């Protein structure tokens, strides 16, 4: 099947006159000097290698029942890692892990919890039903966690000086159990934060981090489809069963994290004699103060604990010109959720779209770029990460122990949940608006005949939930390649509708399986974009930098002072 794009004057897969113009623009926006202009002949070779047949074969294998959902620490994940290594070697990549192999060891702890949650309020005892009304997990590798604490509603649980927002008001919260709203106040008031575009302060991970900083015993996150941006079924499937942590994390006072349904939260608050809706409305104001509910929660979590090692699979394409050890990193996670609760008689969470598709794109990009020859100035590292679904753990391990100093990483480009629905006329690259990579993103999109689309669902906070994010927090500029919305030969709203159907019916469910009807023209577009991005960045002599108003600007300045 030919490499297809939307209607455009650029020939797909080769550098036409439009492509040469795009390269010229790329040189301008990256600050590359004349001697670092990408070799257009080499780029043509790279773009010509990937095929829909090989992409289909990768997805079909990685999403097969044989691999049992590729959960970290399982035989299926080990098979997937070996498969990726073999494809890297076949392409001609060299080992890229710090120890000189293809495998970066990631030491993990798996905790499988069996929790109970009882709330005492106004002489009434409420026993919440596991999975139906709550899920909970220990924050450390503990076989037994028992926590008993007073429940305090802390609104959105945010302390953000840059936004002049503090939900805590210096309230002493040591040993308390915090009841929190998910997302941030911009969800309901477009005049605060980034409006409906979720900030990191709106993510569940930030809220647990902040609760730990304040010495809380636990955190109860209130789920709604709107605020979490996914249904309760995703919570059930993602936070039940084995929960994985990096071995050796610093112990913290926060004993547990939990999600509860809004219905359960309403019952608790109502029993305490408080108007739930009024309380939530007040939480959207800067003058909000924590509300003590005169209620106690007792949680008991007995867990099975196992320690194991998983791997990031890392291959590198070495430059023969650069002498500063600078690199460009391309990522896609290969793990998924393994075997879990059966739905419609199927208990294998195959993860075809999430993220066998992204790994297929990474492998196709690697094969193409390897055929192009040595990159002009920077080496290119291809990183298939483990344990993304458990909290970006593989990417975090890479950041903690990188093959080169972090300051030598020019940029990271991530592919997660690739487009298997067909060609588009536009493309999403999350993070483009945050750094000078934005101009490069526009240029390479134009070279593929595509329009660069802003995040169509900023309220979901997708930027904070995939493997590029640990790079951004460390100060490295990033791009997250997403799926466009304007599909060729489809009705105008088809892309949005298909995304909603996927999230409701397949995301983190056994039904995310290989489909012989997948259409790979869109994924081929993403491979071409990743190829162009990587090759151009590898040819540049300057570092991308964060924009002045980007929340990662300070991290970037700490990483590379003076740039």
Language model: regions and residue ranges:
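Extracellular/luminal Protease-associated
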Residues: 51, 129-249, 253-256, 318, ...
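Bacterial N-terminal signal peptides
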Residues: 17-30
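Noncatalytic luminal/extracellular "stalk/propeptide" segments of secretory-pathway proteins
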Residues: 68-191, 293, 305, 309-312, ...
């Amino acid at each position: 099947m030919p490499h297809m794009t939307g209607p455009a004057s650029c020939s797909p897969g080769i550098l036409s006159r439009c492509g040469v113009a795009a390269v010229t623009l790329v040189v301008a926006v990256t600050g590359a000097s004349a001697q670092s202009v990408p070799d257009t002949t080499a780029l043509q070779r790279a773009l010509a290698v990937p095929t829909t047949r090989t992409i289909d074969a990768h997805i079909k294998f990685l999403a097969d029942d044989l691999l049992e959902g590729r959960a970290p620490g399982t035989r299926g994940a080990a098979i997937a890692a070996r498969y990726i290594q073999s494809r890297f070697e076949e392409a001609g990549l060299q080992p890229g892990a710090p120890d000189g192999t293809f495998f970066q060891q990631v030491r993990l702890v798996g905790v499988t919890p069996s929790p109970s949650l009882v709330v005492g309020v106004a002489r009434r005892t409420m026993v919440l039903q596991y999975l139906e009304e709550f899920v909970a997990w220990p924050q450390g590798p503990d076989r037994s966690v028992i926590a008993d604490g007073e429940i305090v509603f802390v609104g959105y649980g945010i302390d953000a000086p840059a936004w002049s927002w503090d939900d805590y008001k210096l309230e002493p919260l040591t040993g308390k159990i915090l009841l929190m709203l998910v997302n941030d106040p911009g969800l309901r008031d477009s005049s605060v934060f980034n409006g409906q575009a979720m900030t990191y302060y709106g993510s569940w991970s930030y809220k647990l981090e902040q609760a730990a900083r304040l010495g809380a015993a636990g955190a109860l996150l209130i789920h709604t489809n709107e605020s979490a941006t996914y249904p309760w079924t995703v919570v059930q499937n993602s936070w039940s069963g084995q929960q994985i942590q990096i071995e050796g994390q610093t112990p913290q006072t926060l004993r547990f994290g939990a999600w509860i349904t809004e219905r359960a939260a309403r019952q608790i608050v109502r029993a305490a004699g408080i108007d739930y809706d009024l309380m939530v409305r007040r939480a959207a104001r800067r003058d909000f103060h924590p509300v003590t509910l005169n209620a106690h929660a007792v949680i008991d979590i007995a867990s099975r604990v196992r320690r194991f090692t998983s791997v990031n699979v890392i291959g590198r394409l070495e430059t023969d010109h650069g002498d500063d050890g600078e690199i460009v990193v391309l990522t896609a996670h290969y793990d998924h959720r393994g075997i879990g609760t059966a739905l419609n008689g199927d208990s294998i969470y195959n993860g075809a779209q999430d993220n066998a598709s992204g790994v297929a794109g990474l492998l196709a990009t690697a094969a193409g770029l390897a055929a192009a020859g040595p990159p002009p100035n920077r080496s290119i590292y291809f990183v298939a990460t483990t344990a993304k679904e458990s909290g970006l753990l593989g990417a975090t391990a890479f950041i903690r122990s990188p093959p080169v100093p972090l300051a030598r990483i020019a940029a990271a480009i991530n592919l997660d949940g690739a487009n298997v629905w067909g060609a588009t006329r536009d493309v999403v690259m999350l993070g483009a608006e945050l750094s000078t990579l934005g101009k490069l993103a526009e240029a390479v999109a134009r070279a593929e005949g595509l329009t660069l689309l802003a995040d169509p669902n900023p309220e979901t906070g997708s930027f904070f939930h995939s493997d590029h994010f640990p790079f951004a927090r460390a100060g490295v500029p990033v791009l997250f390649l997403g799926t466009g919305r304007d599909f060729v030969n489809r009705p105008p709203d088809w892309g949005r509708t298909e995304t909603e159907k996927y999230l409701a019916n397949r995301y983190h469910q056994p039904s995310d399986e290989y489909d012989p009807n997948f259409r790979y023209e869109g994924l081929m577009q993403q491979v071409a974009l990743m190829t162009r991005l990587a090759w151009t960045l590898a040819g540049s002599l300057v570092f991308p930098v964060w924009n002045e108003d980007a929340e990662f600007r300070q991290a970037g300045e700490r990483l590379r002072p003076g740039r």
